[in-house]
Amino acid sequence: MPGALGVLTWNVAGRLSRLDEQADRVLAHDAGVVCLQEVIPNALARWTQRLERAGYAVAASAVAPGAPRVHRLGVLIAARHPPQVVAGSAPAPWPERLLAADVQPPGWPRALRVVCLHAPLSQSADQAKVRTLEAVYAALAELGDDVPAILCGDLNTPQYEDRDGTLQTFAQTRSGRLRAGRGERHDRAERAIATGPPGWRDAFRALHGYEARDRSWKLGRHPGYRLDHVLVSPALTPVACRYDHGVREDGLSDHSAMCATIALSCSTT
């Protein structure tokens, strides 16, 4: 499809020992935009080197020196044309987990807003997950419908998806009751980010519906969750979307990579 753009998002699990294997697998997809999560500080230089050598320009979130491990998990955006970082795009409480940048795909009349997010876990202190999801949702909702934009990353939601499209969040028990200490605000924040603002679409569900059952995170005997997503704004059409489970099955991460192809909607071309 003319003007179509490949996007890859992957939580690389802060791995160092297998970084070169991870990079080989990322580069094999030849995506126009790459979004990575859990890039630790002492891995960033190697990731940057591998990506730049392959013709990408890289932008990465800032991680404070000496930060505890939970705050050492950064994110990066790589693209064939230099990403222009959008400062202060959303007031996230853990800023190292969020990065927004404008990327100019070849032949597109305007830049693509790329938001790369690694949401904190539900049990994080100070409602970090809820505040992060609310801030990102608000920033996306402020964009006009004609703005091509994507949200990529490990959103750490939902807990479960029914075949009728009903979501169960991590604010709920498996029986559907709200968990003590999480409540309705947590539930609303997860539900909102899982589908995006009005007109936004989950690329995977838009193409495969809710009949498709898949998991992007698995560890040991745990049945896993579908935590890794690409959401697209009304100005975009998802053309293809699938998970690369091979990277997880080969032990390169506890997450599968998501590979999507997007294009400008007819009304914006």
Where are the predicted features?
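Active-site-proximal beta-strand elements of phosphoester/diester hydrolases
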Residues: 4-14, 110-121, 152
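N-terminal, active-site-proximal structural segment of metallo-dependent hydrolase catalytic domains
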Residues: 1-54, 67-72, 266-269
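Metal-dependent phosphoesterases centered on the DNase I-like endonuclease/exonuclease/phosphatase
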Residues: 132-227, 232
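Structured beta-strand-rich core segments of catalytic domains in phosphoester-bond hydrolases
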Residues: 39-120
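Surface-exposed cleft-lining segments at the edges of enzyme active sites
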Residues: 87-89, 117-133, 176-179
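Surface polyanion/phosphate-binding segment centered on an Asp-His-Pro turn
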Residues: 248-269
